[in-house]
């Protein structure tokens, strides 16, 4: 494959559409049909999805797409009503923005992140920056939704 810049000049609609992972998977589910019903199930309760703020605003159905995918595999997923994690790309890494970054995290994500280790294993976060921010302020790295799906399908128990 070629880099998108090599095949598209930006002046017209490109001959391709880049999709988010969950967009692609949600569209592929009907093709999988009954084959997903026989897969192993995770029984530890519903998983908590903390969505990447930019992704949620650019693709407003992204959280519901994840929920649809997880349900197809017999897993319950609860998208959390949160705002920005406070990382905001490089902004949150800059020393002069630490207090503001922490404040944004505490106003939203910090109030919803569970305190005990068992509940934290159910926390999923889409964005790399979001997972970094949770590690920074809550002391653990949440799994990406695809990691949780893989773990459930393989019968693995996530590490504490």
Task: Indicate where each model-derived feature is located.
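Iron-sulfur cluster-binding electron-transfer modules in prokaryotic oxidoreductases
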Residues: 1-160
């Amino acid at each position: 494959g070629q880099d998108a810049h090599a095949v598209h000049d930006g002046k017209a609609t490109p001959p391709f559409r880049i999709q988010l992972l969950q967009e692609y998977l949600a569209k592929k589910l009907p093709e999988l049909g009954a084959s997903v019903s026989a897969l192993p199930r995770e029984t530890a309760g519903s998983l908590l999805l903390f969505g990447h703020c930019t992704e949620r605003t650019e693709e407003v159905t992204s959280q519901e797409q994840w929920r649809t995918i997880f349900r197809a595999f017999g897993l319950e997923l609860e998208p959390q009503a949160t705002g920005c994690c406070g990382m905001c790309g490089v902004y949150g890494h800059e020393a002069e923005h630490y207090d503001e970054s922490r404040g944004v995290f505490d106003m939203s994500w910090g109030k919803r992140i569970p305190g005990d280790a068992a509940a934290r294993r159910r926390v999923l976060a889409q964005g790399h920056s979001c997972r970094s921010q949770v590690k920074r302020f809550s002391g653990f790295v949440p799994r990406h939704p695809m990691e949780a799906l893989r773990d459930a399908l393989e019968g693995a128990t996530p590490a504490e």
